């Protein structure tokens, strides 16, 4: 009898142990690291520019952004954050609605221009998507200001594509060649705030889109490590998509991700054609092609340790005191995602 009771007790202990391990496994992120990064917000989106005054004029006069701050920074923390020795940087934050961009000019040392033959399926492609209340009027404003087209012209995505039907979109380039999208949602799509009457033409930034080589690899980074959630997916193709991207035969897998606050991040994986070029291994923050997305983390020190142990490629020398003055972001570091897009992780 005693032997039988001991046997039953042993089985109970074993069962409880198995249940405990299983429960822990179910609550862990897929790679065991999401809690270390835990992104709670997205933005601003940064772009390196060659001539700050020219860029400020373009974004304020043409796209109605408002200047929020204008600072010049230099010193060891600047060098260590951007990974550029001898850096002296002017940073201008500009706001449109609830969202912001940061224009970054390297006064020293200057970098390389965006390749003149850049295409939308090259992996260095990244744009901000500005929501407009009237596509025809917005396009007319851009034409009056002689912007460089990236799309053939505004496109209305077809009704057969349920997830994108009725969306109007157009790609163009700013004065440095950075791609920008204007986008108008139909009534049944987009956040409620994009449909509130405001009397404004350019409303705010819905998302930043990045070209990726493999959606699953990017999801492991942004969803599983950073903790962002998938908010939507679609597969886009046809003449409208080809002329929007200005890439013949374009067929895209599109995945939208969100954090608790700020604009989304959208993956653009070209299923065809597959001839997009990778981000150059020697791309640096002072090159005009450089863009980076700022992500706000609950625990930036844990995030830095996690990325370091996972051998993620760092742009920064490590976690540094953030020289860019933002409310609450005292420390930060910059890393690269699986395709080489720069991501700044900053403290909440």
Positions of PLM-derived features:
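Bacterial N-terminal signal peptides that target proteins for export
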Residues: 1-9
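Bacterial N-terminal signal peptides
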Residues: 8-18
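Vicinal oxygen chelate
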Residues: 24-38, 40-51, 90-103, 107-108, 114-203, 210, ...
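A generic structural micro-feature
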Residues: 37, 84-86, 119-122, 200, ...
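Core segments of cupin and vicinal oxygen chelate
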Residues: 48-99, 144, 160-164, 211-264, ...
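Extended intrinsically disordered, low-complexity coil regions enriched in Ser, Thr, Gly, Ala
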Residues: 53, 57-73, 107-109, 118-124, ...
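Short, charged/polar, Gly/Pro-enriched secondary-structure boundary elements
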Residues: 111-112, 178, 275-276, 341
